[in-house]
């Protein structure tokens, strides 16, 4: 009979969690079945990212219950492991002897080959419209003609592919899935930008105001509020409401993965959006401007101002006019001629992606598009004597551009649900400032949710 996915996931889960304190230097693990069938896996253990690729590339016969031969027995459906440390090229390598217990495999010669990736899960990951990724879950989906299963628990994300393919091809698919998940779980998705931290110890009640500190890595500011009731809890409860969460259904998630995997410009745009979350504030705008350019290249359209035959006649007339201009020397004439090209201006090409998904841009958003070249060449980065005001200005512009790109991508994959409204930010700040310490949690929570919608 076929491999039981849930049993495999349970085994991987037990194995990883049993050795969650493995040193970060480990970069390779060899897994050996007791029947001499070898399963090789390359692990990269890093401080913030856990990744592994299990390649089950051998036919595995039906197994019976196996007696423990190595190490300690962890659970009924788990691995039995013995650690043998080695040194190789200045890197610490561990060899694991493993018995896979109570798991059945196909006995036929046409036994399927499975690829499995293990990744560290985001702390507050939400996936698809009806699944919160904090419980043991097996999700099946398809993209680019391949069937995938996702297993999720409190800290791990395990992705299994049923389709037979080379390990390098499998890693390309995993990279696309991981990029899609990273995009969906940035802190600006699901209105997390509206979650504030309550610091009740350092302020008196009469200091009840909003204090903006340096921006964190996700483009939002930590906002500390001085109140004499647990406002943070009320905010968190309010923000967990279903109506203000971005949740993709399976078809939308499949389209997102497919576009990332199959379109280089779309993938580049997502890449720079994600990279912007790690950059210094002044550099965030530069990363997002590159993503904006990739969007323009992704949204194919007419590249010429006029038909080529019409432009050829027009160019001939202009060249003649330039040749007869006595005020210009030969070098200047040549420069002017080369400047006249049959190409749509950059300002129009940058707007085109948003027009194609019927996004109506505000004056602030249009102004950001006009400043794109200045931002990219750093001429828009100005510094005054007021560092905080500079930070607020860059943060606001970055947030506007980020959410423009975010909304474009969501609309491109057919998402029709809730999308963050950038104009809500100023409303939220004003809303919180209007409340005082006599406001009850229940009233605050109810009004706060209304403010967000």
Language-model features and meaning:
Residues 224-453:
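Amphipathic, oligomerization/interface secondary-structure segments
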Residues 4, 11, 46, 60-63, ...:
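Serine/threonine-rich low-complexity intrinsically disordered regions
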Residues 1-190:
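Long, contiguous, compositionally biased segments that the model treats as domain-scale units
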Residues 10, 37-38, 63-64, 137, ...:
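Residue-identity detector for threonine
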Residues 171-252:
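Internal, Lys/Arg-enriched amphipathic helical interaction segments that engage polyanionic partners
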Residues 157, 208-211, 289:
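A broad, low-specificity signal marking well-ordered, structured residues that form hydrophobic/aromatic
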């Amino acid at each position: 009979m076929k491999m039981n996915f849930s049993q495999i996931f349970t085994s991987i889960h037990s194995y990883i969690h049993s050795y969650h304190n493995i040193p970060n230097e480990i970069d390779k693990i060899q897994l050996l079945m007791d029947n001499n069938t070898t399963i090789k896996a390359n692990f990269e253990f890093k401080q913030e990212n856990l990744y592994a690729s299990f390649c089950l590339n051998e036919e595995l016969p039906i197994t019976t219950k196996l007696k423990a031969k190595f190490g300690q027995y962890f659970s009924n459906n788990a691995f039995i492991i013995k650690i043998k440390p080695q040194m190789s090229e200045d890197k610490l390598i561990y060899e694991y002897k493993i018995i896979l217990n109570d798991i059945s495999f196909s006995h036929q010669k046409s036994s399927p080959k499975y690829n499995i990736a293990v990744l560290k899960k985001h702390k507050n990951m939400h996936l698809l419209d009806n699944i919160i990724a904090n419980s043991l879950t097996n999700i099946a989906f398809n993209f680019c003609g391949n069937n995938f299963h996702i297993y999720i628990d409190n800290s791990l994300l395990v992705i299994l592919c049923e389709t037979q393919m080379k390990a390098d091809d499998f890693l390309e698919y995993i990279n696309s899935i991981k990029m899609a998940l990273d995009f969906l779980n940035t802190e600006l998705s699901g209105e997390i930008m509206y979650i504030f931290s309550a610091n009740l110890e350092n302020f008196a009640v009469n200091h009840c105001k909003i204090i903006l500190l340096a921006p964190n890595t996700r483009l939002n500011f930590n906002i500390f509020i001085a109140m004499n009731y647990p406002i943070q809890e009320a905010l968190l409860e309010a923000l967990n409401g279903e109506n203000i969460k971005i949740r993709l259904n399976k078809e939308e998630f499949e389209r997102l993965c497919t576009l990332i995997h199959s379109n280089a410009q779309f993938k580049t745009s997502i890449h720079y959006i994600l990279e912007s979350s790690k950059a210094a504030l002044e550099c965030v705008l530069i990363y997002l401007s590159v993503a904006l350019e990739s969007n323009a290249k992704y949204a194919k359209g007419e590249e010429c101002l006029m038909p080529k035959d019409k432009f050829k006649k027009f160019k001939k007339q202009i060249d003649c006019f330039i040749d007869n201009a006595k005020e210009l020397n030969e070098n200047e004439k040549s420069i002017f001629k080369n400047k006249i090209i049959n190409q749509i201006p950059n300002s129009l090409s940058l707007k085109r992606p948003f027009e194609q998904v019927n996004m109506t841009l505000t004056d602030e958003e249009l102004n950001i598009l006009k400043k794109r070249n200045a931002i990219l060449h750093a001429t828009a980065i100005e510094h005054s004597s007021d560092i905080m005001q500079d930070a607020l200005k860059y943060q606001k512009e970055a947030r506007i551009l980020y959410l423009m790109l975010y909304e474009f991508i969501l609309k491109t994959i057919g998402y029709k649900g809730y999308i963050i409204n950038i104009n809500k930010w100023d409303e939220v700040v004003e809303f919180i400032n209007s409340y005082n310490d006599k406001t009850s949690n229940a009233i605050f929570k109810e009004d706060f949710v209304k403010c967000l919608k």
